[in-house]
From Swiss-Prot:
This is Adenine phosphoribosyltransferase. The lineage of its organism: Bacteria, Bacillati, Actinomycetota, Actinomycetes, Mycobacteriales. Its EC number is 2.4.2.7. Homodimer. GO terms for molecular function: adenine binding; adenine phosphoribosyltransferase activity; AMP binding. It is found in: Cytoplasm.
Length: 207
C-alpha cells in the first residue's frame, strides 16, 4: 500500500500567498539589489581584449543573498506584465530567467545559440562586431508560442544585438515580446536604441 502523502506544511502554504512586502517594487528595493550586485561583482580589466573592462556576475549568482535580491528585483518588475513565459538568453539568461520564472510561477523558454537544438527549429542570424551569430528555439509545436507573452531576460545589454535578434526569433514564431530585463547595461554602446519601442528594465549600469 502506498503511504499517504504528508499534509502540506504551513510554511509551504504561506509561500503561495505573498505579502505586499514580497511584491515591493520600490526604489529602495531596487537599490538594495544594485548594492548587492556592486559588492559581489568581479571586475576584470583588459578582458576579453585590451581596453575592455569585463564585469563578471559569477560571484553574484553564487552568493545566495545577492542572487535572491537580484531575482526578486527582476521578478517584481515582471509582475507589471501579463507574462506567459520567461525567455532566458544563452547562457547566463538561463540561470536568471529560470529563477525569475519559478518566482512568478510561469515557464522558462531557453533561447539557444545556433546548433544546440535538434531540428526542426526557428532560426535567426544576426551580426556581431566581428562576425555573425545565430539563435534558435524549437519549432515543432512542443512549445506553443502563438499569441504567448514572453519577457526576455539576459545578464548584460551591450550593443543590443542578441536581445534584438531574440525578439525577432520569437515574433517570427508567433509570440509577443512584452518586455526586456537585464542585470547590467553598458550605456556607452547605445544598445537600448535598438530596443526603444519595448519596455526595458535594468538593475544597474555597468562601470
Amino acid at each position: 500500500m502506498r503511504p499517504a502523502k504528508p499534509p502540506q506544511s504551513k510554511e509551504r502554504k504561506r509561500s503561495k500567498s505573498l505579502t505586499s512586502a514580497d511584491h515591493d517594487n520600490s526604489p529602495q528595493r531596487a537599490e538594495t539589489a544594485a548594492s548587492a550586485l556592486r559588492q559581489r561583482i568581479r571586475v576584470v580589466p583588459d578582458f576579453p581584449s585590451r581596453g575592455i573592462v569585463f564585469e563578471d556576475l559569477t560571484p553574484v549568482l553564487a552568493d545566495p543573498h545577492s542572487f535572491k535580491l537580484l531575482v526578486q528585483d527582476l521578478a517584481n518588475h515582471c509582475r507589471n506584465f501579463d507574462i506567459d513565459l520567461i525567455g532566458g538568453l544563452d547562457a547566463r539568461g538561463f540561470l536568471l530567467g529560470s529563477a525569475v520564472a519559478y518566482e512568478l510561477g510561469v515557464g522558462i523558454l531557453a533561447v539557444r545559440k545556433g546548433g544546440k537544438l535538434p531540428p526542426p527549429v526557428h532560426h535567426v542570424d544576426y551580426s556581431l562586431e566581428y562576425g555573425t551569430a545565430s539563435l534558435e528555439i524549437p519549432a515543432d509545436n512542443a512549445i506553443p508560442l502563438q499569441g504567448k507573452n514572453v519577457f526576455l531576460i539576459d545578464d548584460v545589454l551591450a550593443t543590443g544585438g542578441t536581445l534584438s535578434a531574440s525578439r525577432e526569433l520569437l515574433e517570427n514564431a508567433g509570440a509577443n515580446v512584452c518586455g526586456l530585463g537585464v542585470v547590467l547595461e553598458v550605456s556607452a554602446l547605445d544598445g537600448r536604441d535598438r530596443l526603444k519601442d519595448l519596455p526595458l528594465y535594468v538593475v544597474d549600469q555597468a562601470g
